[in-house]
């Protein structure tokens, strides 16, 4: 028995040393996925090529749409699954906060018949108050929940095996905020909060908007996060418009955001070194809002990666090494939990029973995600809330469904 045990131990030690040696020999690689709205779907094509070539990465940093792709990938979504889910999403509906008419309360139906959509206003302590964005992002946030299976428990950034960083901007002071821990879906939502379009996200004492304003191509964060010796950088930003095409309030606002973004992108590009790999997919005719062209953008990203295939292939490992890396970053998706308790939190003025009357989830039964999301939209349709979200908590071994309505400030 003892000689067999010693031989087995020696073999295991040999494999461990071989893996450690291989990891030590290859350079540490950071992946940088820039922001650009729908153009960011090009990142999917890059991930497909990295997967085919067996190129492992040690961390990923993303901004805006790059944060969405980075987060979904780190949470276990494969490039093929991402192409499928993002390509078939109803983006026009996701970027509309209006619930289906049948999900509106009687009060909200009457208001929708009497007033223009998006014309809400209210009175608060300081006077008249209006929404802080064209949309609250209600449906977008629920979509993020679906992507990363938040119904089985909210993924936390610090718990993901692959280190991931997301960039947001504090709209109060203009500072760059790097999100490395906390709720994955909240970080994705914060990094994508385009000013004026999506309402800022209040999170950890900050009011956060799109990270593209301060760091649309977070090269420095990738180097710092995992000590990357080489960064693979994908820039999908929208080019600036010629001056004669900048017209109207919306056009001027978009150009101002573009100018701020362009300045920080140039600063990031100036730090690239000879060993780094830079991709700029040909997305000239795909706009930041062209979400119906997700598949096409992914194909363009793939083409850009294929053009750099020899350089990317130099970072590849053998099949066994890649399998080890895949196991190391794999995310175990828990089974659908049985709910032991339903909580409603965050209410000050609205009665908790007003929320609970919409909830069909039974205590002791498995969580029914589709029904829950319909119920959440019905709660939102009452018209009293800026947003309504949910999370599944593990409270001393008990699965708690927490529903979190945020009452309107207007």
Spans of features found by a protein language model:
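N-terminal periplasmic accessory domains that precede
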Residues: 398-407
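Bacterial N-terminal signal peptides
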Residues: 9-18
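Bacterial N-terminal signal peptides that target proteins for export
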Residues: 1-10
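Patatin-like phospholipase
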Residues: 22-63, 71-395, 408
């Amino acid at each position: 028995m003892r000689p067999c045990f010693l031989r087995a131990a020696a073999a295991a030690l040999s494999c461990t040393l071989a893996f450690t040696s291989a990891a030590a020999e290859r350079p540490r690689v950071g992946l940088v996925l820039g922001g650009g709205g729908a153009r960011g779907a090009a990142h999917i094509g890059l991930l497909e090529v990295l997967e085919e070539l067996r190129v492992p990465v040690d961390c990923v940093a993303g901004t805006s749409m790059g944060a969405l792709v980075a987060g979904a990938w780190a949470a276990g979504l494969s490039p093929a699954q991402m192409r499928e889910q993002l390509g078939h999403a109803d983006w026009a509906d996701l970027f509309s906060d209006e619930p289906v008419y049948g999900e509106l309360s009687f009060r909200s139906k009457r208001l929708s018949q009497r007033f223009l959509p998006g014309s809400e206003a209210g009175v608060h302590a300081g006077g008249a108050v209006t929404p802080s964005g064209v949309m609250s992002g209600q449906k977008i946030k629920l979509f993020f929940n679906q992507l990363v299976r938040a119904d089985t428990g909210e993924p936390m950034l610090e718990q993901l095996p692959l280190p991931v960083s997301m960039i947001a901007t504090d709209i109060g002071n203009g500072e760059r905020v790097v999100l490395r821990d906390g709720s994955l879906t909240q970080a994705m939502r914060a990094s994508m909060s385009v000013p004026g379009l999506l309402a800022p996200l209040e999170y950890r004492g900050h009011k956060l908007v799109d990270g593209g304003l301060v760091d649309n191509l977070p090269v420095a964060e990738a180097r710092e996060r995992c000590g990357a010796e080489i960064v693979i950088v994908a820039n999908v930003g929208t080019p600036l418009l010629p001056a004669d095409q900048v017209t109207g309030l919306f056009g001027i606002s978009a150009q101002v955001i573009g100018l701020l973004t362009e300045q920080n992108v140039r600063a990031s590009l100036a730090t690239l070194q000879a060993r780094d790999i830079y991709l700029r997919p040909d997305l000239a005719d795909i706009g930041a809002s062209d979400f119906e062209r997700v598949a096409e953008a992914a194909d363009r990203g793939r083409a850009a990666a294929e053009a750099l295939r020899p350089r990317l292939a130099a970072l590849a490992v053998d099949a066994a090494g890649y399998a080890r890396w895949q196991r190391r970053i794999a995310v175990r998706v828990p089974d659908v939990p049985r709910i032991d308790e339903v909580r409603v939190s965050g209410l000050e003025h609205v009665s908790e029973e007003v929320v609970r009357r919409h909830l069909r989830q039974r205590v002791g039964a498995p969580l029914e995600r589709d029904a829950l999301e319909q119920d959440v939209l019905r709660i939102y349709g009452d018209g009293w809330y800026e947003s309504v979200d949910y999370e599944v908590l593990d409270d001393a071994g008990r699965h708690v469904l927490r529903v979190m309505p945020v009452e309107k400030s207007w």
